[in-house]
Swiss-Prot record:
Coiled coil: none annotated. It comes from the Bacteria. It is found in: Cytoplasm. One of its GO terms (biological process) is tRNA threonylcarbamoyladenosine modification. This is tRNA N6-adenosine threonylcarbamoyltransferase. Substrate binds at L134, V135, S136, G137, G138, D167, G180, N272. Transmembrane segments: none annotated. Keywords: Acyltransferase, Cytoplasm, Iron, Metal-binding, Transferase, tRNA processing. One of its GO terms (molecular function) is iron ion binding.
Length: 333
């Protein structure tokens, strides 16, 4: 089965072709960072317009790379939510229209489900059940994954998502958008820090997260410093250490409470070097398994949507109609 995947939930336009027999045939991505940098963050209207401009060229590109024609496609999967409503509508309208023209099924895909399954796309031997740590700019959740479509929410953020906390903390210290990755890089390059930040919500039971207080702690520390570049790096180091250790503590609890020692890390923050290293060390100590998508599949992309769509379409699923329906807010579990 050949499935075209379309991702347009926020500020990246992703398109891919996945084959149920041969795997990922091609994928392409357009990032809108340059468009939004001058505004200091994502502007929804501009994001939607950019998707309109790039969807058709990207579809042509992936079909050419895969050496297939449109009429060879068996289905089209598209992100229907959660995300920015305008951006979602662009992708869904395009997908449904193309599917209608080709007389093939279209299927709405949950953005977070696509992230959860991205590691399985590269490692088909990854079996259910597993615990997933979903860490991105919009989400920070621990999820028990028992099968495709069978999810149980174990813990969620009460305020900022972890990627959001990185970006906001960076902005508070004068690092331009998108600052989260720059902040992490400063932390990685800093050998040591005199600062010790709190590990929020680790002194009580449960698997929920909270990062807004950590962000405030970083701001206060920055304002009390001489605001030199070395101060920025040391605060970044302390902030990242606190975030990573907090995530590790919560993952330890989730694994201990579950019947599985398999952990999957999903979402853009899954590319963080310090987090990857710490999780690999811990999981090795408990003789467990940890799975990360390749860096290019951590952030939003069309490949994960095409893969999730292929899995569901092979079970006979489709939208069953041509009406367009997106869900900007769409709980996974």
């Amino acid at each position: 089965m050949l499935v075209l995947g379309i991702e347009s939930s926020c500020d990246e336009t992703g398109v891919a072709v996945y084959d149920s027999e041969s795997g990922l045939l091609s994928h392409a991505l357009h990032s809108q960072i340059a468009t939004h940098r001058v505004h200091g963050g994502v502007v929804p209207e501009l994001a939607s317009r950019d998707h309109v401009n790039y969807l058709v060229p990207l579809v042509d590109e992936v079909l050419t790379k895969a050496q297939i024609r449109k009429n060879q496609l068996d289905g089209i999967a598209y992100t229907a939510g959660p995300g920015l409503i305008g951006a979602l509508l662009v992708g869904s309208c395009f997908a449904k229209s193309l599917a209608y023209a080709l007389n093939i099924p279209a299927l709405a895909i949950h953005h977070l489900e696509a992230h959860l399954l991205a590691a399985k796309m590269e490692t088909p031997s990854l079996d259910f059940p597993f615990i997933a740590l979903l860490v991105s700019g919009g989400h920070c959740q621990l999820i028990e994954v028992n099968n495709i479509g069978e999810y149980r929410l174990l813990g969620d953020t009460l305020d900022d998502a972890v990627g959001e906390a990185f970006d906001k903390t960076a902005k508070l210290m004068g690092i331009p958008y998108p600052g989260g990755a720059v902040l992490a890089n400063l932390a990685d390059q800093c050998l040591s820090t005199p600062y010790q930040f709190p590990r929020p919500m680790t002194d009580r039971p449960g698997l929920d997260f909270s990062f807004s207080g950590l962000k405030t702690h970083a701001l206060n520390t920055w304002n009390q410093s001489e605001k030199k570049e070395s101060d920025r790096s040391e605060i970044a180091k302390a902030f990242q250490q606190a975030v990573v250790e907090t995530l590790i503590i919560k993952c330890k609890r989730a694994i201990k409470e579950s019947q599985s020692k398999r952990l999957v890390v999903a979402g853009g923050v899954g590319a963080n070097k310090a987090l990857r290293s710490a999780l690999q060390k811990w999981i090795k100590d408990i003789k467990g398994e940890v799975y990360f998508p390749a860096l290019e599949y951590c952030t939003d992309n069309g490949a994960m949507v095409a893969y999730a769509g292929c899995l569901r379409m092979m079970r006979g699923e489709s939208d069953g109609g041509w009406g367009v329906m997106v869900k900007p807010r769409w709980p996974l579990a």
